[in-house]
């Protein structure tokens, strides 16, 4: 038996297919989902969701949202998502390094709003770079 996974953003459906296993980046840590999982509604952090449609794992960068698990169906509703294979690794690396520098600068200052924004941009850039295979 498999799970039906749908990853939906405000703009499009990023994934709509069967998978064997899912690891979600919830706000309280990673959540593994297999066939027969108990019903669950969880908030998702910006991070990487790993899915196993067959033998190999695939990564999808998620930009925060919610996931609902019920009756072997998993609905992931997020602000943004990109399948790792579609992300250019070198571009993602450059964006990650820039976000890391911006976060370091924001940590030096006393502007709370700037720090919050830099932290969010860092998390997004890290998720994209991880999904592209740039870091584990």
UniProtKB/Swiss-Prot annotation:
Name of this chain's protein: ATP synthase epsilon chain
Family to which this protein belongs: Belongs to the ATPase epsilon chain family.
Keywords from the UniProt entry: ATP synthesis, CF(1), Hydrogen ion transport, Ion transport, Membrane, Thylakoid, Transport
Localization per record: Cellular thylakoid membrane
InterPro entries registered for this protein in UniProt: ATP_synth_F1_dsu/esu (IPR001469), ATP_synth_F1_dsu/esu_N (IPR020546), ATP_synth_F1_esu_C (IPR020547), ATPsynth_dsu/esu_N (IPR036771)
Bilayer topology: Peripheral membrane protein
Domain of life: Bacteria
Job description of the protein: Produces ATP from ADP in the presence of a proton gradient across the membrane.
NCBIfam families the UniProt entry points to: ATP_synt_epsi
Pfam families per record: ATP-synt_DE, ATP-synt_DE_N
GO CC terms of this entry: plasma membrane-derived thylakoid membrane; proton-transporting ATP synthase complex
Transmembrane spans: none
GO molecular function, one term: ATP binding
Lineage of the organism: Bacteria, Bacillati, Cyanobacteriota, Cyanophyceae, Synechococcales
Subunit structure: F-type ATPases have 2 components, CF(1) - the catalytic core - and CF(0) - the membrane proton channel. CF(1) has five subunits: alpha(3), beta(3), gamma(1), delta(1), epsilon(1). CF(0) has three main subunits: a, b and c.
GN (gene name): atpC
